[in-house]
A protein has these predicted regions:
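Active-site neighborhoods and metal-handling regions in enzymes and metal-associated proteins
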Residues: 1-209
Length: 209
């Protein structure tokens, strides 16, 4: 059986989108977030994004490669003894550099991440614990499960990281970076002149499609 309700959508800009009312259209990207549950009740959680029709069009491959670089960076540095918060932040630096290369962000990479400017494109955390539940033991409280009793950040984006604690041998966790273009959030931040020193809104708004 599935470990959670499958997310299958060409509207990946809507997080946890369970609306299946649309027909897949050529030229769009399809996001699949799905998992299976074993007879022993252990869960899996896999997220993939592929082009409808099998071929990238226009700028899709550029954005896909940024996400891939973020994923590979996380695999490279994730190990026991470091915090998952530090992994998350290093991945965010890769994200910002990739977006700078596309002309969507600007300025100093570390300053942009420290300020939280990257959260326009990644408004959630890198991953979470996984086990008998997809978000393992989350009902006990994220502060206890994901942060070992330490307080969570209240910053937009970073506060949605479900796992920030020091990693230990035997932990099972997900690595789920992404790049999102959320029209409503883009409009809001631009209207507030938010992080104009880091975000190239003029170029960004050409990605609204």
């Amino acid at each position: 059986m599935t470990s959670f309700a499958t997310i299958l959508t060409q509207h990946g800009e809507t997080l946890h989108n369970h609306d299946h009312s649309h027909i897949l259209e050529p030229g769009r990207m399809m996001l699949t977030d799905a998992g299976a549950e074993r007879v022993t009740n252990y869960c899996s959680d896999h997220t993939r994004t592929v082009p409808v029709g099998g071929k990238f069009e226009g700028r899709q491959k550029d954005v896909y490669n940024i996400v891939l670089a973020c994923h590979d960076k996380a695999l490279e540095i994730t190990r026991p003894g470091i915090t998952y918060m530090s992994v998350h932040l290093e991945v965010c630096k890769v994200l910002v550099q990739g977006l700078k290369d596309l002309g969507l962000m600007k300025g100093d990479v570390e300053e942009a991440v420290a300020a939280g400017a990257h959260a326009l494109f990644l408004p959630h955390g890198l991953g979470h614990m996984m086990g008998l539940d997809v978000h393992d033991m989350e009902n006990l409280g994220e502060v206890y499960v994901g942060y070992d009793g330490q307080p969570k950040s209240t910053e937009f984006g970073r506060k949605s990281l479900r796992l920030g604690r020091k990693l230990e041998p035997g932990f099972v966790l997900t690595i789920e970076p992404g790049v999102y273009f959320i029209p409503e959030l883009m409009d809001l931040w631009r209207g507030q002149n938010k992080f104009t020193e880091f975000i190239n809104y003029e170029k960004l708004f050409t990605y609204k499609d």
